[in-house]
Structures are given as structure tokens and as C-alpha cells.
């Protein structure tokens, strides 16, 4: 087939190095993340499998590799029989022409048994998912924000001695948001400082509430507001929105995320109202649903100086419906429940789709992506990211799914925000 090729390379390596001290009578398989599984330009994507022969005699392996689009459509199938010398190894490499920018699924099987499945990326910054915002998108959100501003926040701030620590004092915050809904959060303030930057942390979908860091020196750098949106986390006890995602989906005016997005803005209102906060240095961060909230905050409110979303949710529902099992089932189920075409549901969702907010973002953005994410597939992350025109950068973690390596990502995020302090 034109554009396809494979390469077999046999390499002798010390058995103790290969097996990490394990001596099992079996052929072992190990995937090598060539180029961290992200490819650009003229370079063909390459996938490799290392075969380790633990036997004392020659062994054969019937290896197959299937390359598919992230939608599941098969593109290429490779088959190769390999002979591996006793206590030796062989590296099998397959390369292929990626037909277009995007993410591709790779499935390795040996003797018809699946042994490894993973995703690779090709030119993710060139993925095209055009705006599908309705004509009244901007006016809808302008009106919604005006309605939020008609609600007096009635901030209540009470010191929480139990959660306070060496470097920061924590306060329980209660306030009124869109349509009079009460929402809650934790406000952590650096001790001994009269002026400081602040970061708003938006939480993931259904996340269990967590307290701010108060006992490591790094946390003294800025204040932090961890906000719980309506019906979730600190507000779970008062939840009247069911499973949140499908609540009120029949109309844009009643959909759950209309109010939740306004809770995102109300959190900014609170931080901005604090006298000691440096108003030019308010940041936003969060993962999954919190990543979506971070991007919404940056799009709808120019008081945010920079944003750091990771594995963002709520993006590119037209493609998300095909890529995400849970989301696809939820959207199709809602269409069936309402007895309407799926296109009608997607029209409603377009008002809440992150990619339709992306062009409104003016502040710098850094995004973290889990290449193996099946909850918020990386395609959907880049659908919105690629429409952002402000300064931006991204980090792809090749072996991670919906959870990034915490220490690594936190360091990236910290260094990013430090540039604006």
C-alpha cells in the first residue's frame, strides 16, 4: 500500500536490563513511545514494540498493528512474524502516512490477543473544528451576565481555624450567584502580606471538596479561591440539578451550565472585591470541568490575567458525541427523551461549547493534555485551543489519560503564572 512501510530491527541487550530482574518463561512486550507519540510536519508517525524472549530457545511472535482514526474507523493493518533469539530482544517498528492532523488509535496484538492500545498525535495544532455558535451567542451571554450583576452577592466570609496553617489563613465563603443560587468556596490568604496576586481554582465534575494548601512555602506566593459551583462539591448537600450535565438541556435558558458559568464569573467578582488582592494579577486554573470553567472565565471576563486549564471538558460537542462514550450516550439519550433530533440538542450545546468561547480569550493560556484521555479526548481539547488567538502554549503528557502527573503539571503551571507576577 502506498505510503506504508515497516522496519524490523533486532538488538541484543543484556537480559537483566530488559527484564528488570524478572526471569519468566514467556515473551514479554514493551511499547516504546517514539517522539513521545506526537509527530509533526513531514515525519511519518512511528510506533514501536519491543519483543523480549525469556526462553532458552528461539521464539516466534505473530505481531499485528491496527491504526485507526480516533472515531474508530480503521486505516491500516500491519502483520509481521518475528523470530527472537534466546534471551534476546527484537524491536518492531511500523510507520504510516497520517491522512490529516488529528489523533490516531494504535492497537498491538500478538497471536490474536490484544497486548497494548494507545493514542498518538499528528499535527494537533492543525486540527480544524470550526465555530458553530448561533447568531445570538454573544447577546445571550451579554444578557446572562447582566442578569448576574442584578444579583447582590451578599458575601459572607468566616475564618476557618481548622483549615488554616503556617503560611495561609483559610476562610469559608458563601455568596449569591445567578438566579439567587447560594454557592460556596474556600478563600486562602497569605499571612503577613498586605498585597498579593490571587488564583481561582475551578473544580472538576462532581469533585470531592478539598482544602487549599496552607503549609508549604510555595503557597505563600498568592491567595487562592477554590470555588464550588451550584449543586457540586461544597454545595452538593443542596443539589437540585440531578446529574448536572443533562439538567435543563431542553433550552439554553434553563440548562445547568448557564448558571454554572455565571458562578465562574461570580468567583471572579469575589476575588476582585478583596482589597488586598492585586487586581492586575488574578489567574484561573482547573482541570476537566474546571478546565472548561477556566477558559470560560478567560473568555467572558477580562479581569483574568492568565489561565491554565488542563484536560478541559465541554468542548466540540459535535465531535465529542462521536468520541466520548459517556457524552455521546448522554446527548443521544437526551434527544430520545425530548423526542427531538440530535442536531437540536447540539444546537443548545453550542451555546456552552468551549470552542465557541475561544475566540473571545485575550489573556495568555497554557493547556495540559493527556494523550490517552478517554473522558475528555485530546481532539476536543485542541478543538477549542486552536481557535484561541492570544499567546498560548500546551504540554502533552503521552502516557497520561484524564489525570496528569501532578508534580510535573503543577510546576509547569507555577512557572507559567510566575511570568506575570
Each language-model region and where it sits:
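N-terminal cap/lid segment of alpha/beta-hydrolase-fold proteins
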Residues: 36, 148-192
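Short, hydrophobic beta-strand segments
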Residues: 82, 92-99
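Short beta-strand element of the alpha/beta-hydrolase
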Residues: 185-189, 195-206
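Cap/lid segment of the alpha/beta-hydrolase catalytic domain
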Residues: 194, 207-268, 319-328
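Alpha/beta-hydrolase fold nucleophile elbow
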Residues: 277-287
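Hydrolase active-site cap/lid region
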Residues: 291, 295-340, 396
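Short beta-strand/loop motif that positions the catalytic acidic residue
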Residues: 360-361, 367-369
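C-terminal catalytic histidine-bearing segment of alpha/beta-hydrolase fold enzymes
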Residues: 375, 382-421
Amino acid at each position: 500500500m502506498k505510503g506504508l512501510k515497516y522496519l524490523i530491527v533486532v538488538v541484543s541487550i543484556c537480559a537483566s536490563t530488559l527484564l528488570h530482574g524478572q526471569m519468566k518463561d514467556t515473551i514479554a512486550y514493551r511499547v516504546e513511545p517514539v517522539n513521545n507519540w506526537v509527530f509533526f510536519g513531514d515525519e511519518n508517525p512511528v510506533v514501536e514494540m519491543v519483543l523480549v524472549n525469556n526462553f532458552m530457545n528461539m521464539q516466534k511472535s505473530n505481531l499485528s498493528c491496527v491504526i485507526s482514526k480516533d472515531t474508530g474507523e480503521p486505516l491500516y493493518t500491519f502483520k509481521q512474524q518475528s523470530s527472537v533469539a534466546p534471551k534476546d530482544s527484537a524491536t518492531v517498528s511500523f510507520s504510516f502516512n497520517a491522512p490529516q492532523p488529528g489523533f490516531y488509535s494504535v492497537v498491538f496484538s500478538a497471536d490474536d490477543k490484544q497486548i497494548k492500545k494507545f493514542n498518538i498525535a499528528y499535527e494537533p495544532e492543525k486540527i480544524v473544528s470550526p465555530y458553530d455558535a448561533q447568531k445570538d451567542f454573544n447577546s445571550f451571554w451579554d444578557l446572562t451576565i447582566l442578569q448576574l450583576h442584578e444579583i447582590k452577592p451578599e458575601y459572607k466570609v468566616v475564618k476557618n481555624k481548622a483549615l488554616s496553617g503556617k503560611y495561609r489563613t483559610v476562610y469559608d465563603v458563601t455568596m449569591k450567584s445567578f438566579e439567587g443560587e447560594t454557592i460556596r468556596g474556600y478563600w486562602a490568604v497569605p499571612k503577613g502580606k498586605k498585597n498579593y496576586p490571587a488564583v481561582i481554582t475551578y473544580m472538576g465534575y462532581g469533585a470531592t471538596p478539598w482544602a487549599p494548601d496552607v503549609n508549604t512555602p510555595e503557597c505563600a506566593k498568592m491567595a487562592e479561591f477554590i470555588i464550588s459551583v451550584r449543586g457540586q462539591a461544597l454545595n452538593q448537600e443542596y443539589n437540585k440539578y440531578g446529574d448536572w450535565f443533562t439538567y435543563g438541556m431542553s433550552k439554553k435558558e434553563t440548562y445547568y451550565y448557564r448558571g454554572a458559568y455565571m458562578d465562574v464569573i461570580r468567583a471572579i467578582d469575589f476575588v476582585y472585591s478583596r482589597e488586598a488582592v492585586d487586581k492586575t494579577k488574578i489567574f484561573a486554573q482547573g482541570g476537566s470541568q474546571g478546565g472548561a470553567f477556566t477558559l470560560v472565565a478567560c473568555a467572558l471576563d477580562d479581569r483574568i490575567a492568565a489561565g491554565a486549564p488542563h484536560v478541559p471538558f465541554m468542548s466540540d460537542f459535535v465531535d465529542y458525541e462521536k468520541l466520548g462514550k459517556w457524552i455521546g450516550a448522554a446527548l443521544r439519550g437526551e434527544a430520545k427523551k425530548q423526542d427531538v433530533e440530535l442536531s437540536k440538542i447540539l444546537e443548545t450545546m453550542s451555546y456552552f461549547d468551549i470552542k465557541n468561547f475561544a475566540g473571545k480569550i485575550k489573556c495568555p493560556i497554557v493547556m495540559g493534555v493527556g494523550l490517552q484521555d478517554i473522558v475528555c479526548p485530546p481532539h476536543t481539547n485542541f478543538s477549542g485551543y486552536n481557535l484561541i488567538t492570544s499567546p498560548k502554549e500546551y504540554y502533552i503528557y503521552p502516557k497520561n489519560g484524564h489525570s496528569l502527573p501532578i508534580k510535573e503539571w503543577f510546576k509547569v503551571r507555577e512557572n507559567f503564572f510566575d511570568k506575570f507576577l
